[in-house]
């Protein structure tokens, strides 16, 4: 049974199938009856909740508050900002009617043609338009600024090719929308939130990221600048893991949102928006997991420790239960989340396989001999190693181990990125090396034409212009024209 539970397609055989197998078998999510939409199962949602809780704390620490805005957006709102509507038009789900009626043939229900909406409603693909229409009523003076709002919501983008967590027609996310009196304040906010995302990715997800600015071709529709964090997955593909946009005055002008400054002069408000989504779940899975299942960083694991009793009879189980209760109390007192699995419908071997598959960072196993010796077996998921340790001070042992696992997972991912990041100077070398995957740093002349040619010929895109990258000027690898710095290329999800 344990073997059957864990049978995953090896990554070396098919990375895509391995990912699909893992999401399903680890009970994270499954496909639904609605094309392109997923059911996030309790274990998967528990991970998302931990992400959500931590990010929400970080937002509030930087002065943000939560609000909620409508799911439906009048179609005319989307037309106000030309670049914005062009960027999202092909992905919009549109509500045209508000009522069903019984089918005259007696077979189910049909759309009532008499219930057509005067103006169609868009199911939000993102909320800039509805929020800036609202902000118009909130802002009159510089005293009303800044507004620092975040929203936790679902959005719909009618994707044609979907994959669980990575690209679905409906997904969960947070979107921050802020309003400022000056350009400098708004730019500072956009960069601040990029730092929040980078800190979360590295310190909680244990996922190293490159911070940078998107090229004009890759920029968010309607933004002046898009800041991004880019991560490298184990198959050598990049994953955009969070974006923060400096919107300038574009949306304020589209919705006529002005304010009176300290001198009484009226000006348009400056704006940002920023967001991460359940796509981070896909990033987490692909950054660390292996052919045995999930590998979760302790800071985001639904439970950090599982205790499995090994016994031959009810008397032994009762004794282990008593000792386990003491261990659980000690661990919880240290802020460590723990599950005790003394269910009798599965054998210990099956449980070991299940918790390995689910990526529980630390497994404790206790049998009759451990009771006699005051010991316990401790196994770590990241290295698949185990040892027997004394029970005295077990909470300190486990706390230290969890810290070490968090650091080790990050270091392993960082080492992978370093080993798969190269610098090239010629387009011929670029075309050869991009086939191996990974990040490539190369010079680019800054034109959309060159960027589009590279994408068409190699399927690689500019992931970002790194903020802390190699600032040595050079010549574009394609055209030979001057280039101020190297940019980051990769094939991407």
Swiss-Prot record:
One of its GO terms (biological process) is prolyl-tRNA aminoacylation. It catalyses: tRNA(Pro) + L-proline + ATP = L-prolyl-tRNA(Pro) + AMP + diphosphate. InterPro entries: aa-tRNA-synt_IIb (IPR002314), aa-tRNA-synth_II (IPR006195), aa-tRNA-synth_II/BPL/LPL (IPR045864), Anticodon-bd (IPR004154), Anticodon-bd_dom_sf (IPR036621), Pro-tRNA-ligase_IIa_arc-type (IPR004499), Pro-tRNA_ligase_II_C (IPR016061), Pro-tRNA_synth_II (IPR017449). The keyword Transferase does not apply. SMART domains: ProRS-C_1 (SM00946). Its EC number is 6.1.1.15. PROSITE patterns: AA_TRNA_LIGASE_II. Keywords: Aminoacyl-tRNA synthetase, ATP-binding, Cytoplasm, Ligase, Nucleotide-binding, Protein biosynthesis. SUPFAM superfamilies: C-terminal domain of ProRS, Class II aaRS ABD-related, Class II aaRS and biotin synthetases. The keyword ATP-binding applies. Coiled coil: none annotated. Belongs to the class-II aminoacyl-tRNA synthetase family. ProS type 3 subfamily. Consists of three domains: the N-terminal catalytic domain, the anticodon-binding domain and the C-terminal extension. Catalyzes the attachment of proline to tRNA(Pro) in a two-step reaction: proline is first activated by ATP to form Pro-AMP and then transferred to the acceptor end of tRNA(Pro). This is Proline--tRNA ligase. The lineage of its organism: Bacteria, Pseudomonadati, Bacteroidota, Bacteroidia, Bacteroidales.
